[in-house]
Regions:
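Cys-dependent protein tyrosine phosphatase-like superfamily
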Residues: 1-107, 112, 119-183
Length: 183
């Protein structure tokens, strides 16, 4: 665990509203977080983690237990976070279907709720015809917004994602401007 993990571990992070059906944030480590989600009428949690973080099996069991305790459906939609493993359109369509077919609100997260979560939300919003400028703006505002987000793997993953799904040159230029601003 690193110092930057402390706010995530103890639930001191925001739960961000994407739209009326979807909320986003980080993994659920504490009972207080799942209680906050229940209070926001969340009926489904979508976990994007692929098991790469230390302690993941225990944390996954804990999160599943919390969901069961609060009668919230827990769904795994594993997504690797590496530059050469950008999911195909089918993956994003399946996650979008999970959200759209849920009768209540869904909460989606990876470990920190930034990169993988941001990419899935970008594709969810793209499927809903949200303005591309807003999608890209949110991708940076909630995902790649700190110097540490632009280390090699994170930045290469972002570029690969943008080139594949949002290939307009202006989006790639914006990514480079954000990187220069923070690095």
């Amino acid at each position: 665990m690193q110092l930057r993990d402390i706010p995530y571990m103890f639930g001191y992070t925001k739960i961000i509203k994407v739209d009326d059906k979807l909320l986003r944030g980080n993994a659920i480590f504490m009972l207080t977080k799942i209680a906050r989600l229940k209070a926001k009428n969340v009926t489904q949690v979508i976990d994007l983690r692929d098991g790469g973080k230390a302690g993941y099996p225990f944390l996954k069991r804990l999160e599943k237990f919390y969901c069961k305790l609060f009668n919230i459906k827990y769904v795994e939609a594993k997504m690797q976070f590496v530059q050469d493993k950008i999911p195909n359109q089918d993956y994003f369509s399946k996650v979008t279907s999970l959200i759209e077919n849920n009768d209540g609100k869904s909460y989606i997260h990876c470990h920190y709720g930034k990169h993988r979560t941001g990419q899935v939300i970008a594709m969810y919003e793209k499927a809903k015809n949200v303005d591309e400028r807003k999608i890209i703006k949110d991708l940076f505002a909630y995902g790649w917004n700190q110097k540490s987000d632009f280390v090699e793997n994170s930045y290469k993953s972002l570029l690969a994602f943008l080139k594949k799904y949002f290939p307009a040159q202006k989006n790639l230029k914006l990514a480079e401007m954000e990187r220069k601003r923070l690095v």
